[in-house]
């Protein structure tokens, strides 16, 4: 999309959770993107690049009365949030004054509290039919070393808050997500609109667009379920050839060109649908058919003896590496007195319409010349 519109595409690593992200995780993403044939150039970013600004933006929201520190337990917050049919209820900490909220948030940053003691929540609408707008948490305490920032931080922003602001700071125009984030878009817009109104973010603001996730027949695509396979030792790892990951497909023999062709053929849609696995396989077949050099193998060999050919004779014959691309050259196929053919390609007695080698007809091995048949091949093999 970026190339078609003379734009640029950013690669951003969402490293807001130090428990889950590490250098290996990041390197595997970059390696997969490079393997597909894409280069982000100077546009590599990390959510952690913006930790200082994200923290200051959160302080602004507190000062504006749009955020508060909630000391409720996770179970209490879950009960107060309500359901799809019942509105949420206010936490008893929702009306803390600005000074207390700022002080608690500062002390959270300085490491005074254990994990889970407090969270910073936005003050939006507890009666909203969209549960994502019922005072979502945007900061949590995590006393864990971050692979890029070390121990500088023990409070970390959550994805929805970080995602929208990072897009705005990078001057993104189109932020593309899968359909599961469609209900998160109002929160995405709410955050950056409030900060833009305060002059902290520049307009025009980015827009989030959603598309359907890929569903392949006979294929488990859920990251959670694939993680269970990896952690349970049912597969060798994420690059197991049975896994539908990029590294798994690579080990299975798929090429980056075939995967890009697959993406072009199925297109982008907002409707959930299932793509037959054969479409992916056809893309690999079509891509390899264009450039793969040909080779011949005999799987069920039957010895063929040319009885009037010198026992020590060798004659060079040649086969094209690709029948449609002569520029790929030829490969030698030495002709000897003894050859091997597929057992199914011989039939001692056959009907008139049979095109196999037989005792009553001449035969011509591929890329050689006609060989008259004067007897049945030996049973060796």
Question: Model regions: which residues?
Answer:
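Extended, non-catalytic structural segments that build the interaction scaffolds
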Residues: 229-251
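A glycine-rich helix N-cap at a beta->alpha junction
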Residues: 25-51, 57-58, 65-68
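Conserved short loop/turn motifs at secondary-structure junctions
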Residues: 12-20, 42-52, 75, 214-215, ...
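Active-site cores that bind ATP or allylic diphosphates and position pyrophosphate for catalysis
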Residues: 11, 15-17, 23, 64-226, ...
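Core structural elements
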Residues: 219-227, 246-264, 309
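Flexible glycine/proline-rich, aromatic-decorated loop/lid segments
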Residues: 28-35, 214-237
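Hydrophobic, mid-to-C-terminal alpha-helical segments
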Residues: 190, 228, 261-292
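Histidine-anchored nucleotide/phosphate-binding helix
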Residues: 1-7
């Amino acid at each position: 999309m970026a190339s078609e519109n003379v734009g640029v595409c950013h690669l951003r690593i969402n490293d807001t959770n130090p428990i889950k992200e590490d250098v290996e995780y990041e390197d595997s993403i970059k390696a997969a993107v490079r393997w597909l044939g894409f280069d982000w150039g100077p546009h590599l970013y990390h959510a952690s690049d913006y930790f200082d600004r994200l923290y200051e933006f959160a302080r602004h929201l507190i000062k504006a009365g749009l955020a508060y520190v909630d000391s409720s337990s996770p179970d209490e917050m879950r009960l107060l949030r309500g359901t799809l049919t019942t509105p949420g209820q206010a936490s008893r900490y929702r009306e803390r004054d600005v000074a207390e909220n700022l002080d608690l948030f500062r002390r959270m940053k300085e490491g005074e509290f254990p994990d889970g003691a407090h969270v910073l929540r936005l003050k939006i609408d507890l009666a909203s039919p969209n549960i994502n707008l019922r005072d979502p948490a945007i900061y949590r305490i995590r006393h864990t070393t971050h692979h890029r920032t070390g121990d500088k931080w023990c409070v970390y922003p959550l994805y929805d808050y970080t995602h929208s602001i990072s897009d705005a700071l990078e001057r993104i125009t189109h932020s593309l997500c899968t359909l599961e984030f469609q209900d998160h878009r109002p929160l995405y817009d709410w955050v950056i609109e409030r900060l833009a109104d305060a002059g902290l973010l520049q307009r025009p603001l980015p827009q989030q667009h959603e598309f359907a996730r890929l569903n392949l027949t006979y294929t488990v695509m859920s990251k959670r379920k694939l993680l269970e396979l990896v952690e349970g030792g049912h597969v060798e790892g994420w690059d197991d050839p049975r896994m539908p990951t990029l590294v798994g497909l690579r080990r299975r023999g798929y090429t980056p060109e075939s995967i890009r062709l697959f993406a072009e053929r199925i297109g982008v849609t907002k409707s959930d649908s299932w793509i037959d696995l054969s479409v992916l396989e056809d893309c690999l077949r079509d891509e390899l058919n264009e450039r793969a050099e040909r080779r011949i193998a005999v799987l069920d060999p039957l010895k063929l003896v040319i009885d009037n050919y010198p026992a020590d004779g060798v004659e060079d014959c040649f086969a094209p590496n690709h029948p449609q691309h002569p520029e790929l050259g030829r490969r030698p196929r030495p002709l000897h007195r003894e050859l091997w053919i597929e057992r199914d390609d011989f039939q001692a007695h056959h009907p008139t319409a049979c095109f196999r080698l037989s005792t009553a007809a001449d035969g011509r091995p591929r890329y050689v010349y006609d060989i008259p048949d004067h007897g049945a091949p030996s049973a060796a093999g």
